[in-house]
């Protein structure tokens, strides 16, 4: 890569400016509770980077524009620089996670009649609060037109991922996306991995929820390895 300048370091990734674009390096660490719990997880970075690579490529093939450029083994991806508002977009197919806290009458894993799209202001110190669509526009995070475009992209991406993993008999529960502007165009950014979605296979988590529930970082890495295998198998079935 040659020249590299650290631009940002978060809980799961470090981002470097290079001549070719931004290099997103995935860490061998896992956190929960907005960083309150943190453990070393050797091998996690490489697994998350490769999984994100495969899923970005898959989504691009399904018409979802992303910031992804190329995989940089073993644990990084090269991406286009983007202007990213502090906004998380969650698509839920079933009741789980924080949804159950605000809607206590819902039973875990109850399917929704149609996917629910949520917007959260991204701020760990505030625990990423849920905000209204009107809030998104009034705060200047997105224009009304951009908001509609983001909802459409999020639903299309989430539905494509759900379809992918259904081919290996896994239940895609929900997913968290981030979007940014590249040359005036809204694109999917950040990562798409077990850190950003919930996937149940045979009733077991192959995502970060396993760590949230158990605190077992070693076991999480083993499940991320299995997630990568499942992803490759699912993709091979898409090509048939």
From Swiss-Prot:
Name the Gene3D superfamilies on file.
ATP-grasp fold, B domain (3.30.470.20), Phosphorylase Kinase, domain 1 (3.30.200.20)
Keywords of the record? ATP-binding, Ligase, Nucleotide-binding, Purine biosynthesis
- UniProt EC number: 6.3.2.6
Entry's InterPro entries?
SAICAR_synt/ADE2_N, SAICAR_synt_PurC, SAICAR_synthetase
Q: For this protein, what reaction is catalysed? A: 5-amino-1-(5-phospho-D-ribosyl)imidazole-4-carboxylate + L-aspartate + ATP = (2S)-2-[5-amino-1-(5-phospho-beta-D-ribosyl)imidazole-4-carboxamido]succinate + ADP + phosphate + 2 H(+)
Q: Name one GO molecular function term.
A: phosphoribosylaminoimidazolesuccinocarboxamide synthase activity
Pathway assignment reads:
Purine metabolism; IMP biosynthesis via de novo pathway; 5-amino-1-(5-phospho-D-ribosyl)imidazole-4-carboxamide from 5-amino-1-(5-phospho-D-ribosyl)imidazole-4-carboxylate: step 1/2
What EC class is this?
ligase
GO biological process: any one?
Answer: cobalamin biosynthetic process
Q: Which domain of life is it from?
A: Archaea
Family that this chain belongs to: Belongs to the SAICAR synthetase family.
What name appears for this protein in its UniProt entry? Answer: Phosphoribosylaminoimidazole-succinocarboxamide synthase
Source organism per UniProt? Pyrobaculum calidifontis (strain DSM 21063 / JCM 11548 / VA1)
